[in-house]
């Protein structure tokens, strides 16, 4: 059993190094719907990958990056609010993905693996690819950390300091899109956003500084992954949703902590 769980455990711990800090920005900037839009659009990536006979997860990465770029452009060049655009894109892509899968008559598609993840099927090859992606995202995040933080805390002050706010928003969206694509096999399209927001929301109850919030979020994420895999192993439950349940449980426990005066 340990041999089966170990690659999944290692992958989850590696992913938490980027889902936690990016989740902090998602919570601060109230971007949860952006994450949902990209994750729900992943089904279209699966359908296109199968149709074009390429690895569906590669198709998901490419599609989420294209959608992130498109959303940045649409937000700046149309009169619609970002929530309206996200709603249109999310439901259009999800519906188009379902219809496209339905048209693939000669191909059997196990949607459950893509919707809720296939965590226990992760192997060391997957871990290598995910690890490379994590290094890229984490390195970029560390390099732009101060600028991203400044534009999040006080956009006006950041602009005075000469920071390009649109560029930072674009970078954050691209990093979030790549993180969601990398995490898709871990927990699936429908619940991937929970890996971003729940540990970050829990960490907010304990942190005093942005950096400490990231640290707490990483700890909460790792605890959720370990607890979820143990729950899955003992009770034969779906691994991805089990991780989310543990994460939600930690959040509920954090609500009993008294607020600082």
UniProtKB/Swiss-Prot annotation:
SUPFAM superfamilies: ABC transporter involved in vitamin B12 uptake, BtuC. Involved in the high-affinity zinc uptake transport system. Belongs to the ABC-3 integral membrane protein family. GO terms for cellular component: ATP-binding cassette (ABC) transporter complex; plasma membrane. The chain crosses the membrane at residues 8-28, 54-74, 84-104, 125-145, 171-191, 214-234, 236-256. Disulfide bonds: none annotated. It comes from the Bacteria. This is High-affinity zinc uptake system membrane protein ZnuB. InterPro entries: ABC_BtuC-like, ABC_TroCD. It is found in: Cell inner membrane. GO terms for biological process: response to zinc ion; transmembrane transport; zinc ion transport. It is a multi-pass membrane protein.
């Amino acid at each position: 059993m340990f041999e089966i769980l170990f690659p999944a455990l290692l992958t989850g711990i590696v992913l938490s190094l980027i889902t936690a800090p990016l989740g902090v920005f998602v919570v601060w900037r109230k971007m949860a719907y952006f994450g949902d839009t990209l994750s729900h659009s992943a089904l279209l990536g699966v359908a296109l990958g199968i149709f074009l006979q390429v690895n569906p997860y590669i198709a998901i990465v490419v599609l989420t990056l294209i959608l992130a770029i498109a959303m940045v452009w649409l937000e700046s060049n149309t009169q619609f609010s970002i929530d309206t655009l996200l709603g249109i894109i999310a439901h259009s892509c999800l519906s188009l993905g379902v219809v496209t899968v339905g048209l693939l008559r000669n191909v059997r598609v196990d949607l459950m693996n893509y919707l809720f993840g296939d965590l226990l099927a992760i192997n060391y090859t997957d871990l290598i690819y995910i690890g490379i992606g994590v290094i890229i995202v984490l390195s970029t995040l560390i390099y732009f950390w101060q600028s991203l933080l400044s534009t999040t805390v006080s956009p006006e002050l950041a602009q005075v300091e000469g920071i390009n706010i649109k560029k930072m928003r674009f970078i954050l969206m691209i990093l979030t899109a790549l993180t969601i694509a990398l995490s898709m096999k871990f927990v699936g399209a429908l619940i991937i956003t929970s890996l971003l927001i729940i540990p970050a929301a829990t960490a907010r109850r304990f942190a005093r500084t942005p950096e400490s919030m990231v640290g707490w979020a990483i700890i909460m994420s790792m605890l959720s992954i370990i607890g979820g895999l143990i729950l899955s192993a003992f009770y034969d439950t779906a691994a991805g949703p089990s991780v989310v349940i543990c994460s939600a449980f930690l959040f509920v426990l954090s609500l009993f902590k008294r607020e600082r005066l």
